[in-house]
């Protein structure tokens, strides 16, 4: 069935890849934006513009009412006030859900694979629920999804790994800028801890498939690579920036990485076996290391890859 899909974050890194994926599959897109540049970008892509932002809950409710389904990717990436922006995401999901209850219209929200409560050393799976008291406040998004599901909303969760291309790579974007600022590319301990990854076009394709076949309460993992060692990531960044690669102890991690220390030393492998089986999704894009090797580290126009450490909003 062809749908009119309301996409939040439609001009963001992932949203801007989802939009053409939906259009090419025959869906119509209603895209949320707050800026004139966003309006021009969406109109050029053949998208109907819906003005608003994450603080305007009424505009979000109106966008959802006007649509057959919702993909929510927008998030304020300000890690200096991470708890606050995660609480905002909870309110956004609750607002979207409030007008979808009982309608059977799908709502696909976004979370991260690191939220899963997996046993140490074992890749997180779609069956792993989030910890009740998770140390990462982004768990609020999945808690909000569970809350609206209990009220009759057909809601599912897309858990993202480090989503990448040759310009942007999730948290690794910030690690690159940190290495640029400090003159060294670092990892914690022996660097054997792992982060999962997926190319942005593979992730976009999965969002579309998940929305089309969404099951209430389902969790989907957009994982192409189960775990890339942080030492490997640090080494390719070091080569790209032409800076030394060093190990920092767990005790030194906070001083070196700042807010990124909450993630830098964690082993977060994740599997997408159930997602691939359920949605016949097969990732085909380049791997994380390949994209890091191909990016231009010294191009002033490389864009968000060198955004300020504290904030990168979309």
Q: Residues of each region from the PLM?
A:
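Mid/C-terminal beta-alpha module of Rossmann-like enzyme folds, strongest
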Residues: 2-4, 206-260, 300-314
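N-terminal Rossmann NAD(P)H-binding glycine-rich loop of SDR-like oxidoreductase domains
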Residues: 3-25
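NAD(P)H-binding glycine-rich loop region in Rossmannoid oxidoreductase-like domains
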Residues: 16, 31-94
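Conserved Rossmann-fold NAD(P)-dependent oxidoreductase catalytic core, especially the SDR/UDP-sugar
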Residues: 28-30, 76, 90-135
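C-terminal amphipathic/interface module of NAD(P)-dependent oxidoreductases
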Residues: 52, 261-314
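Active-site Tyr-X1-5-Lys
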Residues: 130-157
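Glycine/proline-rich active-site loop of Rossmann-fold NAD(P)-dependent oxidoreductases
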Residues: 139, 164-174, 181, 209-220, ...
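NAD(P)-dependent short-chain dehydrogenase/reductase
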Residues: 151, 161-194
């Amino acid at each position: 069935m062809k749908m009119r899909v309301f996409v939040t974050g439609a001009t963001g890194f992932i949203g801007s890849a989802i939009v053409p994926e939906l259009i090419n599959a025959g869906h119509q897109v209603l895209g949320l934006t707050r800026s004139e540049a966003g309006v021009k970008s969406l109109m050029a892509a053949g998208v109907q513009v819906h003005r608003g932002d994450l603080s305007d809950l009424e505009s979000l409710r109106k966008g959802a009412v006007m649509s057959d389904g919702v993909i929510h990717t927008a998030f304020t990436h300000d890690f200096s006030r991470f708890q606050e922006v995660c609480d905002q995401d909870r309110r956004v999901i609750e607002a979207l859900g409030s007008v979808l209850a009982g309608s059977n219209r799908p709502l696909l929200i976004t979370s991260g694979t690191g939220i899963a409560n997996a046993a140490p050393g074992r890749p997180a799976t779609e069956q792993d629920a989030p910890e009740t008291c998770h140390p990462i406040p982004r768990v609020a998004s999945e808690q909000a999804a569970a809350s609206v599901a209990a009220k009759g909303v057909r809601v599912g969760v897309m858990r993202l790994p480090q989503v990448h291309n040759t310009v942007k790579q999730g948290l690794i974007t910030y690690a690159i800028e940190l290495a640029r600022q400090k003159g060294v590319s670092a990892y914690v301990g022996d660097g054997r801890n792992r982060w999962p990854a997926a190319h942005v076009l593979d992730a976009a394709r999965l969002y579309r498939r998940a929305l089309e076949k969404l099951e209430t309460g389902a969790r989907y993992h957009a994982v192409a690579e189960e775990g890339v060692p942080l030492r490997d990531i640090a080494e390719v960044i070091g080569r790209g920036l032409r800076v030394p690669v060093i190990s920092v102890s767990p005790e030194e991690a906070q001083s070196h990485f700042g807010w990124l220390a909450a993630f830098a030393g964690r082993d977060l492998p994740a599997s997408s076996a159930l997602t691939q089986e359920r949605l016949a999704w097969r990732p085909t894009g380049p791997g994380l290391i390949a994209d890091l090797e191909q990016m231009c580290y010294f191009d002033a126009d490389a864009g968000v890859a060198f955004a300020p450490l504290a904030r990168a909003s979309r």
